[in-house]
Amino acid sequence: MNLQQQLSHCQQHQHLLQLTHFNHETAWQLGEKIKQQAELQGVALAINIRVNGQTLFSYAMPGTCAENADWLRRKRNVVELLGTSSYAAGLMLQQRQTSLEERYGVSLRDYAALGGGFPLQVKQAGIIGSVNVSGAPHLDDHNLLLQVLADFIGLPAGSIELLAPLTE
């Protein structure tokens, strides 16, 4: 899959992976599902769900460290700045042959355009926050979020095409 195809898939994913509602209980349920999927895949993740500037779910699985929490913050900052997944942001920057620093004037110490951050979007309301994970390779972080969100909103298994590493 080339860069343009991946960007197109990312746009489709964001359009499809919208929730009908979201509240504190929903955040807890989504966070638990992410934890369960990570356990099934044998990866240790730090997980953060944030809505309107408030953390509604935060969990660090055994095997994670403070560095993972920092990656969560940096990925979340990209989602909040650009309103798209942190993975899609990285693809857009790559396509434009630029960086977060050059295009937006932000520090890479505070922003990371790598997979693992995804906007929480509610139908008829728009983006209300983000769900973020860190602990696996960044494309795996992104794909895990796609899998869990698709299942969480009740999409049929296999209806979301997971992303593979870029090819030319």
UniProtKB/Swiss-Prot annotation:
SUPFAM superfamilies: GlcG-like. It comes from the Bacteria. InterPro entries: PduO/GlcC-like, PduO/GlcC-like_sf, YBR137W-like. Pfam families: HbpS-like. HAMAP family: UPF0303. Belongs to the UPF0303 family. This is UPF0303 protein YE1367. It comes from Yersinia enterocolitica serotype O:8 / biotype 1B (strain NCTC 13174 / 8081).
